């Protein structure tokens, strides 16, 4: 049985971790430079609310999402030591990408990775 550690919580298989990750990346969270408010798109709020729900399921406390879609939560430690904070952003840069997202898992074995066959885009 495979065990994956996510935020200090043991998950019984890597498929659950992958499932969560694919749910996150499937949400259109591109920023909109023409909007002056934060968040600039509904997708950013959707992702923040999903993350808050998942953090609660993982056992974190004091979870909240503020008016700017900033997610807060507390994971209590089990030993004395300094407090650690994690900071990240939910949006992706709007570079006129298609908001219709189709995440894929590629088992990399070296060489170029084909991203778009029609446009011949590789990384």
Predicted regions and their residues:
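N-terminal capping segment at the start of a domain
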Residues: 14-42
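Short catalytic helix/loop segments, enriched in acidic residues and glycine
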Residues: 43-52
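Short, Lys/Arg-enriched N-terminal segments with co-localized hydrophobic residues
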Residues: 1-10
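Active-site metal-coordination/substrate-binding segment of hydrolases
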Residues: 81-123
């Amino acid at each position: 049985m495979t065990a994956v550690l996510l935020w200090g919580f043991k998950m019984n298989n890597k498929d659950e971790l992958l499932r969560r990750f694919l749910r996150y990346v499937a949400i259109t969270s591109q920023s909109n430079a023409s909007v002056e408010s934060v968040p600039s798109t509904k997708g950013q709020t959707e992702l923040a609310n999903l993350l808050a729900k998942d953090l609660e399921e993982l056992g974190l406390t004091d979870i909240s999402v503020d008016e700017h879609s900033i997610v807060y939560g507390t994971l209590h430690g089990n030993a004395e030591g300094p407090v650690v904070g994690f900071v990240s952003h939910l949006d992706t840069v709007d570079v006129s990408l298609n908001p219709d997202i189709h995440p894929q898992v590629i088992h990399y074995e070296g060489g170029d990775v084909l991203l778009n066959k029609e446009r011949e885009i590789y990384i």
